[in-house]
Curated annotation (Swiss-Prot):
UniProt KW keywords: Biomineralization, Cell adhesion, Glycoprotein, Phosphoprotein, Secreted, Sialic acid, Signal, Sulfation
Miscellaneous comment: It is possible that the segments of clustered carboxyl groups mediate the strong binding to hydroxyapatite.
InterPro entries reported for this sequence: IBSP
Positions of post-translational Phosphothreonine modification: 144
Sequence motif: Integrin-binding motif, positions: 279-281
Organism: Bos taurus
Subunit structure: Monomer. Interacts with integrins; the interaction promotes cell adhesion.
Composition bias, Low complexity: 62-74
Glycosylation, residue list: 110, 178, 183
Protein name: Integrin-binding sialoprotein
A Pfam family recorded for this sequence: BSP_II
Taxonomic superkingdom: Eukaryota
Length: 310
């Protein structure tokens, strides 16, 4: 019992001291001096819980939890999944369906991805205003390999057909130039083409070429001249706007435009009137002296010899 009483007394004293210290701190913190010079902010749990909630509550700072912001993203993902499933179904279908789809896709790619560069503001003929329709999803390696092999085979077949058509056109042109084909002569004769027939054909070709050359010379009326086949030509008067003078005639100054013909006009720009102040110095202040000494010699002054009467 004694030990229990001793422990209780010790606990009471400790609690009393702690309460005194708390009361003193409360009184000191309420004073103006401690509020200014000894500010001790008290941290409480409810402040953190109230002023700093989880970021999900703020719509601005949310990254991927709000359904409003990611509505477009979810729809785009669904569209991509639908496209992938449709493509897989098309690939798993029959060979005819796959070939038709590949042809349509190749045509669409050719229309959407045009190689020509257009000017500013122009719209490509394939894309237009279709948004993201020109973007294609990547296919599997096996499908691309099959597609490449089929395209190579189709290209080779097209090249062979073009070569055959070109050869047929060349044969037709040769037959048209020669007039009559060798096959027709063989059928008519029954025993092959003879030398006389060939000679007649050669003669006809020569006559045709001679007639062509004669027609060209008559229509062209070519004439020879000592200057290597070229004639000296004079340009039309309308080209230069002026008539050239005849050969051997010398032009007079009156035929050209003359400036500064006026008494006071020295070719400067004139303001307000014909005899206005021009730009620059024309020595108008010395006009009287110049006119007075104009007809006199350098050695005379007032009609007398300057050096003899000195």
């Amino acid at each position: 019992m004694k030990t229990v009483l001793i422990l209780l007394s010790i606990l009471g004293m400790a609690c009393a001291l702690s309460m005194k210290n708390l009361n003193r701190r409360a009184k000191l913190e309420d004073s103006e001096e401690n509020g200014v010079f000894k500010y001790r902010p008290q941290y409480y749990v409810y402040k953190h819980g109230y002023f700093y909630p989880a970021l999900k509550r703020f719509a601005v700072q949310s990254s991927s939890d709000s359904s409003e912001e990611n509505g477009n993203g979810d729809s785009s993902e669904e569209e991509e999944e639908e496209e992938e499933t449709s493509n897989e179904e098309g690939n798993n279908g029959g060979n005819e369906d796959s070939d038709e789809n590949e042809d349509e896709e190749s045509e669409a790619e050719n229309t959407t991805l045009s190689t020509t560069t257009l000017g500013y503001g122009e719209i490509t003929p394939g894309t237009g205003d279709i948004g993201l329709a020109a973007i294609w999803l990547p296919r599997k390696a096996g499908a691309t390999g099959k597609k490449a092999t089929k395209e190579d085979e189709s290209d080779e077949e097209e090249e062979e057909e073009e070569e055959e058509e070109n050869e047929a056109e060349v044969d037709d042109n040769e037959q048209g130039i020669n007039g009559t084909s060798s096959n027709s002569t063989e059928v008519d004769n029954g025993h092959g083409s003879s030398g006389g027939d060939n000679g007649e054909e050669d003669g006809e070709e020569e006559s045709v070429t001679e007639a062509n050359t004669e027609g060209i010379t008559v229509a062209g009326e070519t004439t020879t001249s000592p200057n290597g086949g070229f004639k000296p030509t004079t340009p039309h008067q309308e080209v230069y706007g002026t008539t050239p003078p005849p050969f051997g005639k010398i032009t007079t100054p009156g035929e050209y435009e003359q400036t500064g013909t006026n008494e006071y006009d020295n070719g400067y720009e004139i303001y307000e009137s014909e005899n206005g102040d021009p730009r620059g110095d024309n020595y108008r202040a010395y006009e009287d002296e110049y006119s007075y000494y104009k007809g006199r010699g350098y050695d005379s002054y007032d009609g007398q010899d300057y050096y003899s009467h000195q």
